[in-house]
Amino acid sequence: MAKVIGIDLGTTNSCLAISENGQTKVIENAEGARTTPSVIAYLDGGEILVGAPAKRQAVTNAKNTIYAAKRLIGHKFEDKEVQRDIESMPFEIIKANNGDAWVKAQGKELSPPQISAEVLRKMKEAAEAYLGEKVTEAVITVPAYFNDSQRQATKDAGRIAGLDVKRIINEPTAAALAFGMDKGDNKDRKVAVYDLGGGTFDISIIEIANLDGDKQFEVLATNGDTFLGGEDFDQRLIDHIIAEFKKEQGIDLKQDVMALQRLKEAAEKAKIELSSGQQTEINLPYITMDATGPKHLAMKITRAKFESLVEDLITRSIEPCKIALKDAGLSTGDIDDVILVGGQSRMPKVQEAVKAFFGKEPRKDVNPDEAVAVGAAIQGEVLSGGRSDVLLLDVTPLSLGIETMGGVMTKLIQKNTTIPTKASQVFSTAEDNQSAVTIHVLQGERERASANKSLGQFNLGDIAPAPRGMPQIEVTFDIDANGILHVSAKDKGTGKAANITIQGSSGLSEEEIERMVKDAEANAEEDKKLTELVASRNQAEALIHSVKKSLADYGDKLDAAEKEKIEAALKEAEEAVKGDDKAAIDAKTEALGAASQKLGEMVYAQAQAEAQAGESEQANASAKKDDDVVDADFEEVKDDKK
């Protein structure tokens, strides 16, 4: 059976896990780390860096280094949250032809799913390296409060990366899965999963029930904010530093892309340090310069100051907790365990706020960075048929419906309905002899249609002429286990039907996705070629170094013709290494190896002779030592004092 990997595709960091025979393991990436920064860098020559290597070069390549792409996924350029991010991001966010928010790097226009696919591809490669086999299937997690557009876009990202996404599951649900399966007891419990990640916040109330040895995870309610996370906490600190520096020096660092990137790194580091210490210092020499010369930034930040800067963000996370509890029909006293997930939940002030609201200490035995990937891996093993002791009942986070007369939204599926689910309702025409209707699909909680998220629209035509209110048009909403919506409309009189799978949403057409899949495959081939070229170059340079050293030591023992032949081969190999032709490098390396064979034999013979001489010298020294030994008689002396 094909293995299904679990991927937590995070805003700031991503994580990969696999579950086999009931045992889960977090898989390390190529750099040996258990989490991978969700950072992608596009270089001049077309090379793409992902993770730590991309993060390391961000300061010198700020405009082409993309982070937090997940905040843009499934969003329109005009969305107020996107407009807010444009002001703080050092890279360029643009409006795509379809109105979506895309990114421009190295002159190329890139969609968020395309960018996220690079992170997923790195995860896929790490899994293949660990398992020693090809991996094509995955379970990918998304914030519980992601809407249909964002879920579809995440699925598209997986497809571009060469992965068949078997299931999209909610991050808090995955974390609860990891927590519940780790507990050996059979106790039924209600848990609150507070998930404050890099870019999004979710709260889910989940009931874990034991059913004859199997565990059922039922999501009772979920709520959240897809634009609240660690990135916002970082930004508050960055804004504070910029304001203080402007007061002192009169220079606005917001206009300096390189300075902004350095500030981002420093703010993230300071934030982490303030989780364990009471004060930290930010030192950024040569942050900028003016007519008087270079300027240095040195500033002390206390934990109390940082907490005051982000107090309202922490308060903002508590409101969805209240709504989720109310929707679940529970009070804080009904919650058995509070689980913290997401890196930002490590902040002491966040933990204090959660404890104050729920009236109990959050659990510390769940790894906030890895739990989501572990849960996804467990679900992956369930889907591959590897285990059957887990049943997951998730919900749709937002209500779904259509626009009806008067510009109102009529809901067909209420929020927090367990999925998969299906609902139908009969509607009619608003005008006499109306021959077509437009089905406008919406997602959200507002009564006014325009205040909700538009997921797409389609037409049902050829309706038989009839007075208004007479034709019967049945609209059916069908949500699959991924939380992705399929809508159909049928004229009950004529039997004519039309349907739509809400895809617009990732903004990508089938043709665009296919092109991006091909681009990603081409990139993978390019990466492979680059790796092979670097390996050949390293091999050649190692041989060049070795031959040069041997020539310096033993060149005078070679005849002139032999030495000339080696020097010529050496020169050709050095020239080949400067180029990008792998075949030429390999050929010249082989030629140098053949030309320097006699020199190599000479070096080997000399090394053997030296080794034998060393052994002989050691034997003589040992014999001399034996000759110097004096035989002696020993007599035991008894101590009378004892």
From Swiss-Prot:
Question: In the UniProt record, does the keyword Membrane occur?
Answer: no
Q: Per the record, GO CC terms?
A: cytosol; external side of cell outer membrane
CDD domains this protein is in? ASKHA_NBD_HSP70_DnaK-like
> Residue spans with biased composition (Acidic residues)?
628-642
* Positions of post-translational Phosphothreonine modification: 200
Where are stretches of biased composition, namely Low complexity?
Answer: 608-622
What keywords does the record list, in alphabetical order? ATP-binding, Chaperone, Nucleotide-binding, Phosphoprotein, Stress response
Q: What induces it?
A: By stress conditions e.g. heat shock.
UniProt keyword DNA repair, yes or no: no
Task: From the UniProt entry, list the residue stretches annotated as the region Disordered.
Answer: 608-642
Q: InterPro entries per the record?
A: ATPase_NBD, Chaperone_DnaK, Heat_shock_70_CS, HSP70_C_sf, HSP70_peptide-bd_sf, Hsp_70_fam
What's an example of a GO molecular-function annotation for this chain? unfolded protein binding
**Biological-process GO terms, alphabetical:** chaperone cofactor-dependent protein refolding; protein refolding
Q: Pfam families, from UniProt?
A: HSP70 (PF00012)
The similarity comment for this entry is:
Belongs to the heat shock protein 70 family.
Q: Known NCBIfam families for this protein?
A: PRK00290.1, PRK05183.1, prok_dnaK
Functional description taken from the UniProt entry: Acts as a chaperone.
Q: What else is known?
A: Present in outer membrane vesicle formulations which are used as vaccines in human.
> Sorted alphabetically, which PANTHER family does this protein's record hold?
HEAT SHOCK PROTEIN 70KDA
Q: What name is this protein filed under?
A: Chaperone protein DnaK
Q: Source gene?
A: dnaK
